[in-house]
C-alpha cells in the first residue's frame, strides 16, 4: 500500500546547528501517528517543514504526499494538497462569529456576492461533523477553549483536509473536553482522515495512536506499533536513558507552620455575587510541598492569586507569614513579604517574549543590582550566569530572546527569576503544563532541592499522578471550598476524587 505521507532524510539547519538530522516518517491513510520527543527535539521544526512554514529549498530531503513528490513553498499550497496544521496557540478571530471564522479567506460566493445562506448551511454540517452544538452566528470569543479547538478542526475539514496535524491539542482542555476531542479524532480516522498527533500526555498517545514515532536531538530514534509499547518504553526512547522513577521523591524535614491562611473568600471578576473562593483556611509548614488538587473551576488559581496579591476581583481574609499579618494589595507586597508565584500561563503572565533570557530572570530583583539608581551590569550578569547554571536552563547565551527557548527552559527561567528574590513561600501553579517528561523530572528534582533548603512550596496541579508523586500533603478543592486536607501517605487518585465530590469535609 502506498503511504499517504512519506518524509525521507529531512535535514534542517539553523546556521551551524542541525535541528533535524536525517528524519524519516511515514503514515497510511486513516492512520494516527503520534510524534513524541522532548521540547527542542525537533518535532515542531519537522511539522513546519511539512506544512510549508519552512518552504522547499530551505531544507534537505524529500516529501511525498499521496504518491506525488511535493515542493510546497507556502501554507496555502499545503492546505490545497489537503494537509492542515492546528497549532497549540489557536488562530481564530475572537470577535468574529463561528461562521465567519470557518470561511475566513475561503468565503462562498454566488455571482461575485457572498452567499451567506450556503455558508450557513455548510457551517451547520461542519459543526455537526465535529459534534459541536452551537449556532453558527455565535461569537467565537464567547466559547470555551475546547469548543474553539473543535472549530479549528471544522475549519480544516472545510478545506477537505486528508491529513490533520494536531500540536498539543489537549494542553488547555478539561478532561471532558479532551474525551470529546479524542473521540472526534477516532471518528475521523474511521472516515479515512489521517492524523499526526503531538502530545506530552503519554496516556493519550498510547490510547489514540496506531504508530508512535520518537525524535531525539533532531534524529529519528524509531517508529513502533503503539500496542507494543509501554509508557516506560516511550520515555526511554525520548530521553535516551531509563527513568526508573518519574517522581524523584527525596527525604526532607518538615518544620513549624510558616504560612497561615484564614477565611479567604474571592468573588468573581464578572459577577460580584458569585464566590470563586469560599471561606478557605489552611496552613503551610517550613520545607513542605503542599499539593492543591481539584477539578477545573474549583477556585485553585483564584486562591493562589489572592495569596500573591494579584487577584483582579474583590477578596477578603487574612494571611500570616511567620506570625506576621500581611497586607497583600499587589505582587510587590507579596514579593517584599517573601511570597513568590510562578503563574499558570507562562506565555501570557510569566515571560516577556521579546526580552532576553537574562532580562527575564532578573526582572523581579533589579533593585538588588542597583546602586544610587544605576544598574550594576557586572553584578547582574553574574547572577544571571549562576541562575542559568543552577537551574540548567538550556540556552546558547543569556542574551537570546526567551521566546526561542523550549517550554521547559522558559519555565526554569521563570523559576530562576523568583528564586532570586529569596522567597519563604513559592507558589507553583501548573508548573509542568505543556513541558516534556525530561523537563518535568528536572523541575521535580528542583522542588525537592528547594524544600531541603527550607523553602515551602505550594503546587497547584490538574495532574493527579503529579500531585500524589510530589506532595507531602494535599488540599482538595471543589466549587471554591476545601473539601479535604490529606496527609499523602499512599493516597490514591480515587481517594482524592471521592473527597472532591463528597458532601463531607475530610481532614
Swiss-Prot record:
Transmembrane segments: none annotated. It holds the Pfam family ABC_tran. Its main location: membrane. The keyword Nucleotide-binding applies. The complex is composed of two ATP-binding proteins (XylG), two transmembrane proteins (XylH) and a solute-binding protein (XylF). ATP binds at residues 37-44. Belongs to the ABC transporter superfamily. Xylose importer (TC 3.A.1.2.4) family. One of its GO terms (molecular function) is ATP hydrolysis activity. It comes from Photobacterium profundum (strain SS9). The gene is xylG. Part of the ABC transporter complex XylFGH involved in xylose import. Responsible for energy coupling to the transport system. This is Xylose import ATP-binding protein XylG. One of its GO terms (cellular component) is plasma membrane. Residues 5-242, 259-504 form the ABC transporter domain. It is a peripheral membrane protein.
Amino acid at each position: 500500500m502506498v503511504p499517504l505521507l512519506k518524509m525521507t532524510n529531512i535535514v534542517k539547519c539553523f546556521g551551524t546547528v542541525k535541528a533535524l538530522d536525517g528524519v524519516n516518517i511515514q503514515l497510511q491513510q486513516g492512520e494516527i501517528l503520534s510524534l513524541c520527543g522532548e521540547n527542542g527535539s525537533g518535532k515542531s521544526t519537522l511539522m513546519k517543514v511539512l506544512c510549508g512554514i519552512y518552504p522547499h529549498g530551505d531544507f534537505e530531503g524529500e516529501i511525498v504526499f499521496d504518491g506525488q513528490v511535493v515542493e510546497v513553498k507556502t501554507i496555502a499550497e499545503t492546505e490545497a494538497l489537503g494537509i492542515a496544521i492546528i497549532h497549540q496557540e489557536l488562530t481564530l478571530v475572537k470577535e468574529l462569529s463561528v461562521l465567519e471564522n470557518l470561511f475566513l479567506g475561503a468565503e462562498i460566493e454566488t455571482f461575485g456576492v457572498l452567499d451567506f445562506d450556503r455558508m450557513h448551511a455548510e457551517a451547520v454540517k461542519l459543526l455537526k461533523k465535529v459534534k459541536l452544538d452551537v449556532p453558527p452566528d455565535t461569537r467565537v470569543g464567547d466559547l470555551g477553549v475546547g469548543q474553539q479547538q473543535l472549530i479549528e478542526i471544522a475549519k480544516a475539514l472545510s478545506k477537505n483536509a486528508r491529513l490533520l496535524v494536531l500540536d498539543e491539542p489537549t494542553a488547555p482542555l478539561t478532561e471532558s473536553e479532551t474525551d470529546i476531542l479524542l473521540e472526534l479524532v477516532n471518528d475521523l480516522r474511521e472516515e479515512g482522515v489521517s492524523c499526526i498527533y503531538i502530545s506530552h500526555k503519554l496516556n493519550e498517545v498510547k490510547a489514540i495512536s496506531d504508530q508512535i514515532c520518537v525524535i531525539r536531538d533532531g534524529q529519528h530514534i524509531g517508529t513502533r506499533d503503539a500496542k507494543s509499547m509501554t509508557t516506560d518504553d516511550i520515555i526511554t526512547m525520548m530521553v535516551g536513558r531509563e527513568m526508573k522513577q518519574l517522581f524523584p521523591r527525596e527525604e526532607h524535614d518538615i518544620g513549624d507552620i510558616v504560612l497561615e491562611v484564614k477565611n479567604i473568600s474571592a468573588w468573581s471578576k464578572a459577577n460580584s455575587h458569585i464566590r470563586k473562593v469560599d471561606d478557605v483556611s489552611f496552613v503551610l509548614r517550613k520545607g513542605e510541598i503542599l499539593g492543591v488538587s481539584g477539578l477545573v473551576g474549583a477556585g485553585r488559581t483564584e486562591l493562589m492569586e489572592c495569596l500573591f496579591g494579584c487577584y483582579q476581583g474583590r477578596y477578603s481574609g487574612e494571611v500570616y507569614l511567620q506570625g506576621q499579618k500581611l497586607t497583600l494589595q499587589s505582587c510587590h507586597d507579596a514579593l517584599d513579604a517573601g511570597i513568590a508565584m510562578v503563574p499558570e500561563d507562562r506565555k501570557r503572565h510569566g515571560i516577556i517574549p521579546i526580552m532576553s533570557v537574562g532580562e527575564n530572570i532578573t526582572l523581579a530583583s533589579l533593585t538588588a543590582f542597583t546602586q544610587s539608581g544605576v544598574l550594576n551590569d557586572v553584578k547582574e550578569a553574574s547572577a544571571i550566569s549562576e541562575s542559568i547554571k543552577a537551574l540548567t536552563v538550556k540556552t546558547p547565551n543569556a542574551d537570546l530572546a526567551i521566546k526561542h527557548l523550549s517550554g521547559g527552559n522558559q519555565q526554569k527561567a521563570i523559576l530562576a527569576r523568583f528564586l532570586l528574590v529569596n522567597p519563604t513561600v513559592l507558589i507553583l501553579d501548573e508548573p509542568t503544563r505543556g513541558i516534556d517528561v525530561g523537563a518535568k523530572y528536572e523541575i521535580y528534582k528542583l522542588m525537592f532541592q528547594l524544600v531541603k533548603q527550607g523553602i515551602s512550596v505550594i503546587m497547584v496541579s490538574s495532574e493527579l499522578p503529579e500531585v500524589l508523586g510530589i506532595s507531602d500533603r494535599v488540599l482538595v478543592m471543589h466549587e471554591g471550598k476545601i473539601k479535604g486536607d490529606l496527609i499523602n501517605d499512599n493516597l490514591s487518585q480515587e481517594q482524592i476524587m471521592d473527597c472532591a465530590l463528597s458532601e463531607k469535609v475530610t481532614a
